[in-house]
């Protein structure tokens, strides 16, 4: 059985760990609030992009739309842009994304990995398939990072190296639920186009020069760019939410362990005192 001194040492260790996990919980909560504010701004931007594309879809013929949207090659390869975090200690956030990657990606596919955690987890297995590696950057540099990634993705698509561009990321549902997704973003499928055309939220008229088809052809990378911004924003919320929950659980477990150790310490101390009293009484009786 543990000695009183070792129990005291364990209590101090757990108390120190609790201070760290509680501090990380508070930091994650603060970052979560900021991430939600940033997501709201990105979502507004995406809504504007969606509305503009809805109007373009309304002003382009079905044949022209199919011509623009159809895959330009017969490549068996797909491109996956994977969003993870730079840091760990976020529960199953990164592990779930990595698991989905391994279930989805084949040996013919190509990867662009965002987040150093994903780089570390996937580099060895998919080294020959990775075409770009990036850390998560500050918000001021995110636009530059996204722009470079989308340009590279479309270069592979236009060269016929891949037949589609896909995202693997984590969608924020609520503070307790985050869902990892694999989402095809280009070429658009007919169902997505139909959903856009059926929306009627725009009540103003747009004119296109030289034509809606030409505008759409040039604007497609901008659309995919906006979707990657959104995927990264919702992934960031998911990361901070998962880390806050993980640290909250760790703090709660520390409290429980401290309570158990404290009770064990008191039992040990009481037993020691009782034994000392018995020894004193026994010694007195012997005299």
UniProtKB/Swiss-Prot annotation:
Note the subunit structure.
F-type ATPases have 2 components, CF(1) - the catalytic core - and CF(0) - the membrane proton channel. CF(1) has five subunits: alpha(3), beta(3), gamma(1), delta(1), epsilon(1). CF(0) has three main subunits: a, b and c.
Identify the NCBIfam families for this entry: ATPsyn_F1gamma
What's its job? Answer: Produces ATP from ADP in the presence of a proton gradient across the membrane. The gamma chain is believed to be important in regulating ATPase activity and the flow of protons through the CF(0) complex.
Keyword Cell membrane in annotation: yes
User: What are this entry's molecular-function GO terms?
Assistant: ATP binding; proton-transporting ATP synthase activity, rotational mechanism
What protein is this chain from? ATP synthase gamma chain
Q: Which residues cross the membrane?
A: none
Q: Which domain of life is it from?
A: Bacteria
CDD domains associated with the record:
F1-ATPase_gamma (cd12151)
* Cell location: Cell membrane
Give the GO biological process terms: proton motive force-driven plasma membrane ATP synthesis
Swiss-Prot/TrEMBL keywords: ATP synthesis, Cell membrane, CF(1), Hydrogen ion transport, Ion transport, Membrane, Transport
| Family indicated by similarity | Belongs to the ATPase gamma chain family.
InterPro entries found in the cross-reference section: ATP_synth_F1_ATPase_gsu, ATP_synth_F1_gsu, ATP_synth_F1_gsu_CS
GO cellular component terms given for this protein: plasma membrane; proton-transporting ATP synthase complex
- Membrane topology according to the record: Peripheral membrane protein
């Amino acid at each position: 059985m543990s000695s009183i001194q070792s129990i005291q040492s364990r209590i101090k260790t757990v108390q120190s760990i609790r201070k760290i996990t509680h501090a990380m919980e508070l930091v994650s909560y603060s970052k979560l609030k900021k991430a939600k504010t940033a997501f709201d701004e990105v979502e507004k931007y995406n809504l504007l992009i969606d509305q503009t594309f809805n109007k373009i879809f309304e002003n382009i013929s079905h044949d022209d739309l199919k011509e623009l949207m159809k895959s330009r090659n017969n490549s068996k390869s797909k491109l996956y842009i994977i969003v993870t975090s730079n840091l760990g200690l976020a529960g199953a956030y990164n592990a779930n994304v990595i698991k989905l990657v391994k279930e989805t990606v084949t040996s013919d596919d190509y990867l662009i990995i965002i987040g150093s955690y994903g780089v570390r987890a996937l580099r060895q297995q998919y080294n020959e398939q990775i075409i770009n590696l990036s850390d998560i950057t500050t918000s001021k540099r995110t636009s530059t990072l996204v722009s470079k990634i989308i340009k590279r993705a479309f270069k592979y698509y236009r060269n016929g190296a891949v037949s589609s561009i896909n995202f693997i990321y984590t969608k924020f549902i609520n503070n307790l639920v985050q869902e990892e997704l694999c989402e095809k973003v280009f070429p658009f499928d007919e169902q997505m186009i139909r959903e856009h055309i059926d929306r009627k939220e725009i009540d103003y008229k747009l004119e296109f020069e030289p034509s809606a088809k030409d505008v759409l052809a040039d604007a497609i990378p901008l659309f995919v760019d906006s979707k990657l911004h959104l995927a990264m924003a919702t992934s960031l919320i998911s990361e901070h939410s998962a880390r806050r929950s993980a640290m909250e659980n760790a703090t709660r477990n520390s409290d429980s362990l401290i309570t158990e150790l404290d009770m064990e310490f008191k039992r040990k101390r009481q037993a020691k005192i009782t034994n000392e009293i018995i020894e004193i009484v026994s010694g007195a009786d012997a005299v």
